[in-house]
Amino acid sequence: MDQSNRYADLSLTEAELIAGGQHILCAYKMKPKAGHRYLEAAAHFAAESSTGTNVEVCTTDEFTKGVDALVYHIDEASEDMRIAYPLDLFDRNMTDGRMMMASFLTLTIGNNQGMGDIEHAKMVDFYVPRRGIELFDGPSKDISDLWRMLGRPVKDGGYIAGTIIKPKLGLRPEPFARAAYEFWLGGDFIKNDEPQGNQVFAPLKKVIPLVYDSMKRAMDETGEAKLFSMNITADDHFEMCARADFALEAFGPDADKLAFLVDGYVGGPGMITTARRQYPNQYLHYHRAGHGAVTSPSSKRGYTAYVLAKMSRLQGASGIHVGTMGYGKMEGDKDDRACAYIIERDSYTGPVYHQEWYGMKPTTPIISGGMNALRLPGFFENLGHGNVINTAGGGAYGHIDSPAAGARSLRQAYDCWKAGADPVEWARDHYEFARAFESFPQDADQLYPGWRHKLRPAA
């Protein structure tokens, strides 16, 4: 059934829709299946995403038609389809009237992903008007809160050197806590790897007090504050809160140095919102494990990593992993810096839409996945700044000397970039950074050819 007379209006302009402030706009790359006309398939997509179905129903009235989603732009050659969703379509909380990400996803990326007349459709950008922005929670804490605890300026406080406890699984409580202590002697921030939780060989009630003891020892010995991001991901929100509450009690007077990590893609938006609302005084660390199933460029359905990052800020994530932009082991390229810019800036023009954030706090880009000191100078140069958290697991625990030396090499890499220095020359006067060349020789050969002749290996 051709529904384009009702669910498409190509006379609408994007500028008018944005000026009106009453619609969320979504841009997709959409291709219909063979034998289906583009506008007809697009209109069916909009119908399925809002008030319609595959036939006319007798219960539809004029009010219903007033909240139809409308296709307002198509370009078949570039597979560009854009839809305007009235704000009133989206579900609101009974308790406080605020918007919810679950409803946004249900409408804009729900049943339309399995429609029989659509070959593929992937959301590449979306726009939220001011009224919508103000109805989402947004972050309660941001990187400035971490800088403050670390004794740094709250503006442009710089690079936070972090790690992931490695190996990913298999450490018992005492070795786990020892690994944390050894890194904290040189670094700032430690996160659980995403599978680490309450395994039978490492129960949280034993691990967390030992980790806190390691933190206190490291703070006493270095005179620096330290930060720990604990994984509270669980199927049950009550279990999440039980883990969080236990950790807060264990950390006691240093509870402000405790962040909560939530696997937001596998756990869903309800898990992020639970953590954001139940623990507004903690830094909310959004891990995105599994996202590549839909965000990968090889997938033509779902949504992009840029869309995921943008959603995370609306939900209230203090920080989210944004990949390594081609400088680490994760899929991506240099242009992925847009994922960082949309979450950290007050406004940004993405692939399709310009987004203003109207005072919503920023979300920190978290860089992780195959990074080490040798890869960081190029990464910072591409991004244009170092106001990020970097969690380098192998980059710290794979350092030839120690995890503490690995942490120092990461800090020295940031200082190298900030000074505009040549990394090989910088290594001559920065021992831990120099030893990173020997720790990761394949990277050194690729990134800094001739380093072996220019840099005498340390004894």
From Swiss-Prot:
Signal peptide: none annotated. It holds the Pfam family RuBisCO_large. Mg(2+) binds at K191, D193, E194. The keyword Metal-binding applies. Substrate binds at N111, K168, R288, H321, S368. Keywords: Calvin cycle, Carbon dioxide fixation, Lyase, Magnesium, Metal-binding, Monooxygenase, Oxidoreductase. The record marks K329 as: Transition state stabilizer. It catalyses: 2 (2R)-3-phosphoglycerate + 2 H(+) = D-ribulose 1,5-bisphosphate + CO2 + H2O; D-ribulose 1,5-bisphosphate + O2 = 2-phosphoglycolate + (2R)-3-phosphoglycerate + 2 H(+). It comes from the Bacteria. Its EC number is 4.1.1.39. It is an enzyme of class 4 (lyase). RuBisCO catalyzes two reactions: the carboxylation of D-ribulose 1,5-bisphosphate, the primary event in carbon dioxide fixation, as well as the oxidative fragmentation of the pentose substrate. Both reactions occur simultaneously and in competition at the same active site. This is Ribulose bisphosphate carboxylase. The lineage of its organism: Bacteria, Pseudomonadati, Pseudomonadota, Betaproteobacteria, Rhodocyclales.
